[in-house]
């Protein structure tokens, strides 16, 4: 077997952390990765910018172009290499990506893989749900204020994956724009309790603990909330989740802010559209 030639990790083995750091131009120093070079080399940055501006470049102006193309290692060469790599992927999107070599998640409890026994108490939640909801708890406010899709799926292991996408609605029901995004996991425990971890796109991570209220209702409250400096000042939350007699997924979420006690934040009733 011929040994791999040139820089870069051995293609027959996974790259080491040191190899990856070298490829992206960094090294581990004092417990952190620090840059060792600028990924866009400065010897032709101005030349590349000028080329983009007027569609041409003159090697006499200090650029890295030669009669045979960009000088290897120059900024021009890096740009050209990136363009060539993009040719194979520029027309593709998420839906075009080949499937993973492992079973896909399912939101249908009748499909394989089977639901893990630990998740049986949460079985009614598994599915794809879509509907509308409202903010707060204003008297007389009955018009939907947002739309929402919730996907609760599994891969046969003892947890459920949770994803929520919402969109804001105008008073006439038309779409106003995108709303909140959440991803997380339900993790049922041997003692019957439930952990729910939720990450919010607005810069917050919540850890809920709770228990079943019945065979089709669950109550949870936050034990910990982490926020980035730019996130809303939410300091706690509760969620009551249940399946209604007519088969909808319904919930009420309360939130507490740094200067406001727990109060209703959102509520919705979602129809099962898959699962």
Predicted regions and their residues:
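Amphipathic/hydrophobic helical signal segments and adjacent flexible N-terminal regions
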Residues: 2-50, 55-159, 246, 258-275
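Short secondary-structure boundary micro-motifs
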Residues: 105-106, 112-118, 134-137, 168-171, ...
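Residue-level recognition of well-ordered beta-strand positions that form the cores
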Residues: 128-134, 163-165, 197, 221-223, ...
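Central antiparallel beta-sheet cores of small beta-barrel/beta-sandwich binding domains
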Residues: 139-230
């Amino acid at each position: 077997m011929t040994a791999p030639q040139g820089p870069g990790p051995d293609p027959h083995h996974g790259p080491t952390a040191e190899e990856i750091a070298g490829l992206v131009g960094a090294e581990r120093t004092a417990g952190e990765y620090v840059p060792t070079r600028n990924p866009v080399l400065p010897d032709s940055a101005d030349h590349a910018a000028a080329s983009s501006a007027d569609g041409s470049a003159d090697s006499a102006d200090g650029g890295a172009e030669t009669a045979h193309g960009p000088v290897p290692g120059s900024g021009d060469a890096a740009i050209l290499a990136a363009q060539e790599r993009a040719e194979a992927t520029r027309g593709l999107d998420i839906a075009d990506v080949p499937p993973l070599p492992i079973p896909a998640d399912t939101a249908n409890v009748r499909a394989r893989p089977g639901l893990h026994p630990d998740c049986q108490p949460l079985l009614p939640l598994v599915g794809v749900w879509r509907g509308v909801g409202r903010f707060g708890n204003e008297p007389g406010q009955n018009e939907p204020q947002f739309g929402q899709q919730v996907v609760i799926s599994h891969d046969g292991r003892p947890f459920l994956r949770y994803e929520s996408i919402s969109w804001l609605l105008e008073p006439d029901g038309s779409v106003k724009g995108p709303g909140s995004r959440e991803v997380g996991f339900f993790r049922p425990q041997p003692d019957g309790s439930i952990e729910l971890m939720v990450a919010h796109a607005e810069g917050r991570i919540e850890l809920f603990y709770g228990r079943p209220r019945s065979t089709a209702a669950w109550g949870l409250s936050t034990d910990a909330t982490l926020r980035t400096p730019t996130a809303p000042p939410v300091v706690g939350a509760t969620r009551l989740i249940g399946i209604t007699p007519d088969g909808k997924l319904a919930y009420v979420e309360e939130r507490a802010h740094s200067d406001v006690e727990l109060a209703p934040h959102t509520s919705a009733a979602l129809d099962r559209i898959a699962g």
